[in-house]
């Protein structure tokens, strides 16, 4: 299957121009995350991971997540680039979003910036924003990319795209 990347307009970037292996860089702008009517993240210190065909995955500093909003969850997964990830439940009041976040306690060489940062699936939260823009979650139940008007695809994640 031949993929035809969408052409980016002014101020946009194509996920097909992102590198593989992925690159880590600072997010320019403010990141907010809300669950159960509570703002659990409000930061200007987030990082994003850029990988070919994926919308950016946003990692927020643990220190910028409201106390008590994270709790350990069972299970791990492995990324060929970043290493072994652990999972976290996200908690706000009486609501628990099971395994809605992940982190790399000992990331692989080249990804050390991700220590003490957590990625949260935007589709499992009530609202995520990037610089005031409402984020759309990447399709599928594995990847946690943040789609905004700044990025164009097509994006990996939907059924039939795993082989890209």
Please tell me what each predicted stretch does:
Residues 1-164:
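Terminal leader/tail segments of proteins
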